[in-house]
Each structure stands twice: as C-alpha cells, then as structure tokens.
C-alpha cells in the first residue's frame, strides 16, 4: 500500500468472481493510493467476469475494480493498457470505480459488457472528491451508463473517448467539472446528460455524436446546466442539443448541428471587446492555437537499450545524491534510463539530458531533493559526440517532497530545439528556455515559458503551490484541463504570448488575496474557456481578470465562464 508499486498483468485472461480492491494500509492515510495496475495492452490483458457470476447478480452496483473512496488522498493511482470484460447475466457489475488525486490516470483501457449486463462502465461518481485526474484513450461498450461523473470536486480531464451501445445514457454528469476532447459516441440514447440542480459544468471539443435512431425523441446532448462546445458535430438525433436550464440558457438545436464554438448560456465576457450580448456570436473573430498530439516515443528493446540507474552507482535509499549516477546512465548510450520501483532516490545539483537517451522512466518510483536539482535538456553536449534523440520523455515519477509546498520542485529546463514530454509526474517545474515543443500530461507541478515563440501543450495539469502557477512570456500555451489551489495567479500571459485554455478549475480553499488576479494578460492574447470555482470558506476569488493592452489596464472582479482578451 502507498508504495508506488506496479501490479503487472502479463498477456492472458484473468477471471474474477468478486471485486478487486486497492490495498489497505496500516493507517487510513496510507490506503488505496500509489497503486498502478498495468496490463500488456487491451488485446492481451483481459480481466473477465464470467457469465452469471453470483457476486454481480444482485441489485446494488458492485465494482469489478475499486480504487478507494474519499477524501482526496488517492495519489497516483492508475489503470493502464488492459480490458475489463463483463459477461452476460451480471446486472450489478460496474467495470471500474476509479479514484485518483492530483495525479493519476486511466489510459488505454477498454470496458465492455454483454447485452443487458452491467450498470456503469467507468464510474467516477461513486464517491466525493475524485480528481484531479486524466482519462485518455478509453472505450466503453454496453452497460446502462457508459461513464458517470458526479460530486462537486475535483475536476476530471478526458481525451479520446468512445462510447457505444449504452442502454440509458452514454455519459451522466452531476455536479462535476468535466473537460473533454475527442468524444465519439454511437448510441440510441443521449450521449451526454448534464443534470440540473447542480454545479455541473462540461467543456466538449473536437467531438462527434452519432445517433443510431433518427426518429428518437431523445436529444444527442441533454444539458440542464453549464456547457461549452467547440467543433462538436451531432447527427442522427431529432434534437441535437437540448439546453433546458430553467429558461436561463440559449435554447435548443433542432436536427443535426455542427457547433463551431458556443456556450449554453450568455456568459462570455471581455475587457476590451465590445459585446452587445455575452455570446460568441457577438465576440467577432476568436483565434485558437492548433492542437498537436503528444508524440509517441518508441520503447526499444529492454534487453539491449535500457539502463538501470543502480548499475551506475545510484543509492536506492536516498541517503546520498544519485545525480552523478543518473548522468553516467544517460551518457552510457542507452535509449531508456529507468529508476527501479520501490526505491527513493535523491537528486541534488545538475544533470544534462543529452545524447541518445529518449526516455527517463521512474517505473512509478519516487525521488526527492535536499538542496535543489535541475535537469537540463541540451543539444550537442554528449561527451563522446553521440547523436541526440529528437524527443525525450520523463515519466512515471514522483518527487514526494514537493507534493505540497513546491519549494523543492525538481526543475526540468528545456534549453533545446528537441521535443520534451513530461508525463504522469508529480513535483516538477518545467522551464521553457529553448525552441523545442513541450508536452505535459497527467502532470502535477508548474510551468514557465520563458523563451518567446516556444510552444507547450498541456493535458491535465494540477498546480498546488502559492503564487503564480503558470507563466507564458511570449510563448504559445495550449491547455486542456487545469486545476489550481492556494492563492496566486493561475495563468500569466505576457509580452506577446498566446494562451488557449479550455477547462479551468479554481479551488480557492485558502481564500484569496484581494489585489491578486486569477488571470493576468499583458500585451498578449488569451482565450480562457470553461472556468469554474469551488469555495467553502466564504472568501472566493475577488479579482478574476486583469488585462493590460498598451497603456490601459482593465479589471473584472466577477466570475465568467469564458473570457476573451482583445
């Protein structure tokens, strides 16, 4: 329990007769966290519930896999690269009840049930305080409900989701903040239901919703709360979108629809644009950054191209500095350098990432620093002149001392023209000081783009320290899903920068500093869409937007769902 351990399922079929539960620790704070279930791929590792399994034949929903209940302490849980298959005559089965906090993911997973079997495929609504977390490359087939997202905390980001053949609803959201890109739904029932009488808020972009029965009276999207749409196609339904939030919404879309960009309500604001009404139709041209997909970096042959940091003198106890060992492993010519699980490495000082290495992987292990560590991605500096890999991935690693305050974050400096990917990592600060693209995924830390013209794409980023969280100085910054807590500006866009952020959650759980803006724009461009706040101490954000263009500064103290710069 709580050990950053990987449970590996080799290729095969694994029959289960009852719920697989995440481990219990000696104390509640040690339970159901830092546990990673890793398969060999959706075609190779299958967890199967046989037909008519007694444990799943009752009336109360029962999970095949359960990963823990509230509070928000389920750090780094993950389910990866496998299939969950529910056989016939299992009406109570829930494919996966998943919970993770700050950083954790469901990636490359298929959940399917036979006809008339199963309640929910992916259940993210069985307990409060789920998230922030990342779901990517998920397919759900069958079940009454494909996906369930509920409760008012802590936001969930999705990318590339396929829903098919649900019996009641494709997706049921109540209260939760959902940030979604790339939904494809083939269904006879509504693809999305965003339920009334809640704080539920959804952003949906780059999605296709296909109805399989055009004469069906159900809408493709049944929205009763707050939604933002961009590049969403709905076809095969009598009504594409039904907005019915007590006459506060903009109305319905009848027949097929292709929404270029719109909101369910009139809640688009701008400090410098004149809006006759608070809609995109009144906003004029709105420019978005092009979306780049995170590059897929080859794994190579572990027997020939991987290097274990222990073989180069690293200290697995963390009592002494292992930066020298990491540098030697990088310079060895290996394509992958790995930090074995179960160890706690200490890194102080500087390491240069150079030469053929293209992946530094923690195998879900942990590290820390006592005096500060900087990993520099540099070009042409290998001591033996070996060629640099075009892309470098740093992934599946926790800097545990930086989890709360951020004072001892491990700094990754991109000084290179090469691509940098940081994925499934906690406790890092990425500095963009070069020309190469930066990709952050399932990331808990902070980001600064310091070199004008450099670009970053972020998919689920969580920022937990006080002070400025993300700073974009003249770069191009794209975000899908951001959660921030503690006081301090969420995003600064400065000196010609361009920020395009969709899905932002502010958890102002420590109050707010009155003169500190949540978002600061100076002689730059920003599109901020899908902004939500949760506050339970009666001291919410008091200054939302400060924008300076030329010599003029304007502020907005009230919240907005969408904010457009000049």
Regions found by a protein language model. Give the residues of each.
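Short, intrinsically disordered, low-complexity segments enriched in Ser/Thr and Pro
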Residues: 135, 499-525
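Extracellular "leader-to-stem" segments immediately downstream of a signal peptide or signal-anchor
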Residues: 1-10, 16-88, 92-95, 99-107, ...
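A structural signal for short secondary-structure junctions
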Residues: 198-200, 485, 496-497, 521-522
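Extended, compositionally simple hydrophobic/Ser/Thr-rich segments
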Residues: 132, 148, 155-161, 170-171, ...
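A structural signal for leucine-rich repeat
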Residues: 244-246, 471, 493-496, 517-520
């Amino acid at each position: 329990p709580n050990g950053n351990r990987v449970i590996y399922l080799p290729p095969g079929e694994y029959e289960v007769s009852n719920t697989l539960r995440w481990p219990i620790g000696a104390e509640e704070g040690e339970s159901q966290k830092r546990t990673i279930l890793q398969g060999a791929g959706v075609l190779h590792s299958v967890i199967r519930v046989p037909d008519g399994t007694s444990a799943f034949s009752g009336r109360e929903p029962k999970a095949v896999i359960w990963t823990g209940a509230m509070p928000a302490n389920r750090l780094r849980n993950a389910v990866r690269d496998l299939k969950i298959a529910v056989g016939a005559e299992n009406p109570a089965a829930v494919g996966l009840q998943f919970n993770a906090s700050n950083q954790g993911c469901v990636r490359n997973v298929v959940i399917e049930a036979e006809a008339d079997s199963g309640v929910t495929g992916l259940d993210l609504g069985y307990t409060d305080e789920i998230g922030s977390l990342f779901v990517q490359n998920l397919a759900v087939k069958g079940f009454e409900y494909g996906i369930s997202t509920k409760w008012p905390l802590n936001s969930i980001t999705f990318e590339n989701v396929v829903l098919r053949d649900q019996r009641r609803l494709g997706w049921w959201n109540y209260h939760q903040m959902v940030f979604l890109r790339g939904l494809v739904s083939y269904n006879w029932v509504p693809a999305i239901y965003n339920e009334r009488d809640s704080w539920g808020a959804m952003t949906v972009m780059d999605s296709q919703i296909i109805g399989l029965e055009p004469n069906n009276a159900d809408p493709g999207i049944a929205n009763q709360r707050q939604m933002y749409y961009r590049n969403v196609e709905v076809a095969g339904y009598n009504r594409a979108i039904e907005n019915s939030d007590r006459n506060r919404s903009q109305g319905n879309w009848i027949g097929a629809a292709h929404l270029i960009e719109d909101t369910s309500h009139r809640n688009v604001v701008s400090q410098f644009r004149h809006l006759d009404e608070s809609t995109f139709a009144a906003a004029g041209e709105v420019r978005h950054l092009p979306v780049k997909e995170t590059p897929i970096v080859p794994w190579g042959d572990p027997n020939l191209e991987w290097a274990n940091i222990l073989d180069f003198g690293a200290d697995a106890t963390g009592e002494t500095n292992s930066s020298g060992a990491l540098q030697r492993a990088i310079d060895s010519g290996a394509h992958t350098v790995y930090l074995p699980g179960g160890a706690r490495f200490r890194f102080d000082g500087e390491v240069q990432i150079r030469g053929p290495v293209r992946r530094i992987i923690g195998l879900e292990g942990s590290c820390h620093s006592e005096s500060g560590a900087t990993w520099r991605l540099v070009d042409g500096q290998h001591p033996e002149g070996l060629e640099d890999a075009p892309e470098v991935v740093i992934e599946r690693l926790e800097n545990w001392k930086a989890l709360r305050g951020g004072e001892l974050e491990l700094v990754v400096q991109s000084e290179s023209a090469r691509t940098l990917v940081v994925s499934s990592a906690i406790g890092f600060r990425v500095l963009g000081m070069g020309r190469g693209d930066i990709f952050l995924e399932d990331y808990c830390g902070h980001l600064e783009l310091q070199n004008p013209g450099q670009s970053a794409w972020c998919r689920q980023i969580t920022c937990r320290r006080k002070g400025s969280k993300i700073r974009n100085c003249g770069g191009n910054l794209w975000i899908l899903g951001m959660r921030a807590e503690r006081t301090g500006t969420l995003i600064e866009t400065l000196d010609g920068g361009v920020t395009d952020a969709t899905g932002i959650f502010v958890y102002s759980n420590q109050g707010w500093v009155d003169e500190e803006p949540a978002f600061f724009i100076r002689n730059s461009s920003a599109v901020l869409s899908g902004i939500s706040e949760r506050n339970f101490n009666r001291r919410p954000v008091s200054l939302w937007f400060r924008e300076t263009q030329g010599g003029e500064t304007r502020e907005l103290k009230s919240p907005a769902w969408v904010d457009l710069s000049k």
